[in-house]
Amino acid sequence: MKKIQLYLMFILSVTLLSCSSDSDDNNSNQNPSTNGFLYAENGSTTMTSVSSPYASNQYKSIFAVNNSNTIIEINLTSLAVGSYTIDDTTNFFAYLKPGTTGMWTGSAGTVTITANANNKLTGTFSITSGSGISDVNSVSGSFTNIPIQ
């Protein structure tokens, strides 16, 4: 039942947040220690940032939002400091690649939360396997001092 609820929340989030035009601004950055949310696909060393990352304490989720579009959603069992295995049953990772209509869902990987203090969340993620978009094989990145709402 909990998995169904998380899945429904994910679908609702994607539906509500993905209804605006795409921006041509790529916000590329190669400094992973910058506050915010950075990600790259397929092992690229060029990191891309998003404009409005945040974590939801209520849903135990991390959102990477760019110009009102959800790019990455991570649903976990907790936002406590620790390591979480992405397995598509208890911990879920979704990547909505800009410029496409597809969704890549992670089936293996790890999300590590290294700090949760003062309503800010910091950590890393490395999703090594998934499906849904043929040219995406992996997604990795970091989030540093993103606000917890």
Regions found by a protein language model. Give the residues of each.
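Sec-dependent bacterial lipoprotein signal peptides
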Residues: 1-19
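Edge beta-strand at a domain terminus
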Residues: 127-149
